[in-house]
Every structure is written in C-alpha cells, then in structure tokens.
Design a protein with these regions (language model features):
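Phosphate-group recognition and catalysis centered on beta-loop-alpha active-site segments
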Residues: 3-277
Length: 277
C-alpha cells in the first residue's frame, strides 16, 4: 500500500515538473491553407492569414507550388475545380483555369474577387510583421530535385530578410527519404512527417520517429488511440487534419492528439471547449 502511494506521488510530482510547451509546440491549432475566411476554404490568402491571426491562431499551413517560371506561390493545386473554388472563372482565361500559371498571372488574379494571392516572399513579409507566427509548408512534391528547388527558394528568400525566420518555418515531409533531402538544404528545428501520402506501416512510422525526432500529422481516419499513444511514447507530437467539428476535436484530444489542422477553429475557440483535456 505504501509503495503504491509512493508511486502515485512520484507520478504526480513528475506531471507538475513537466515544463510547459513553448514556441511552435505551445500552439494546438494549425490554420489550414492560412485558415478559412467568411466561410471559404483553401484561399491561402493574405486576408485569411490576418483574420485568423486576429482570432488567436499563430501557426499557419500554406500550400506551396511552383509556377511555370519557377516561383513559389500559395496555391493548393492547379486544377479547374480549384479555380472554380477560388472564384477565378472570370479573371483567368478558360485555357488557364486547369494548368500551371506564370507567376505574374497568378499574383494578378484575385481570389473570390477580393482576396490577395500570396507567394513565399509575401508570406515571409507577414512573418516579419507578425514575429510570433509560424509557417507549416505543404509543398506537395516528392521528387528530390523539385523538393530541393522548393526549399532553396524558401531558405534563400528568408536569408535575404533575416535567417532567424527559418526558425519559424516547419516543413512537412511526405516520406522518410524526404527528410535527408530537406536537411541538405537547411536543418530546420521542427519537422512534421505527414502521412496522407505515406505507405509506411504504423511500426515503420514509430521507428522513424524514434530515429529522427520528427513530429507526425495524419488524417483523422488513421488516428487510433493505440497508434497515437505509441507515437507519443516514441517522442512525437501528434497532429490530425483537417478537423472543424468540436466533438471530433474533443474525441481526438482525449486519445492524446496534440494539435489540429482546421479551417474554422481558432486557439480562442479551442480554449472554450469545456470537454477538452
């Protein structure tokens, strides 16, 4: 009996001694595609960033693609459906609505008539203006040459302003091999291994976390309590995407999930969820 009480005391003291998370790890919300704005998603726009920042979000995921002239811009995909979703049927010629754009045409095409497109230069300008904001990259590409090109563009643009900006850039990688490709360009302090393209088994992912120290993000469908707990035991913070429902956030949080990619839930909203652990 005395031994059991002593063990409980040790556990309790251990919990009290845990340092609160700081920096990137202190935030639980990742604003998906710069966050939703006025009910719209996937805008990756300047106005979405500002609106979600004002609502308390500090971590912003941006979709980043190369233009035909090799500039890095914030767009989810080069498809007709995306052009329709972004309300660009009138600002883009029909032949351009489902193809990769030139940089100038992309930047000169308003989103939903009123929102401003972003490129990596303007995103880094925002990070300078908002010095507690973090960027999570969703660069899509997996071929080593394209990955290298994308991350060189990111690092070179940051270094022209202030190399310290790179401390607030969090790359997403899509395979275990991609970590080495990114590290050859720049060693970022935080890396997220996103599993939505991965064919790795749970065991392979857990082993990779132990070897590399990366954190994990995954679709909700893959987030089982057992997998989440094993990842956390291996040392990872665990994120799930893309979640906009309070009940689902509460359920996943109780499983041990640390953070949530979301369109419409802010850090302020999260703090009001009474059932959240």
């Amino acid at each position: 009996m005395i031994g059991a009480l002593a063990l409980l005391l040790v556990i309790a003291l251990g919990e009290e001694d845990k340092e609160p998370a700081t920096g990137f790890a202190s935030h639980r919300i990742v604003a998906h595609a710069m966050g939703g704005i006025n009910g719209y998603t996937y805008t990756n726009s300047l106005e979405a960033f500002v609106a979600n920042y004002e609502q308390g979000s500090r971590v912003f995921e941006a979709d980043l693609l190369l233009t035909t002239d090799d500039r890095l811009v914030a767009r989810h995909e080069w498809t007709i459906n995306m052009s329709k979703l972004l309300g660009q049927q009138t600002v883009l010629p029909a032949a351009k609505q489902g193809t990769v754009l030139e940089y100038a045409q992309f930047m000169d095409s308003p989103i939903l008539d009123i929102y401003s497109p972003l490129d990596i230069e303007k995103i880094l300008d925002l990070m300078q203006a908002y010095p507690d904001a973090y960027l999570v990259t969703d660069t899509k590409e997996t071929e080593a040459g394209l990955v290298t090109e994308q991350f060189k563009l990111i690092t070179e643009a940051a270094e022209r302003r202030d190399p310290a900006l790179l401390e607030r850039v969090v790359p997403q990688i899509y395979s275990r091999d991609m970590l080495d490709v990114v590290n050859k360009v720049h060693v970022f302090p935080e890396i997220l291994y996103t599993l939505y393209q991965s064919q790795d088994s749970d065991e392979q992912v857990i082993d990779f976390v132990q070897e590399s120290g990366v954190d994990i993000t995954m679709p909700a469908a893959r987030a089982t309590k057992s997998f989440v707990q094993k990842l956390k035991k291996a040392g990872a913070r665990v994120y799930v995407h893309t979640i906009n429902d309070e009940d689902e956030i509460v359920k996943l949080s109780r499983m041990g999930v640390d953070g949530f990619y979301t369109d419409f839930v802010s850090e302020v909203d999260l703090s009001s969820f009474r059932r959240l652990r």
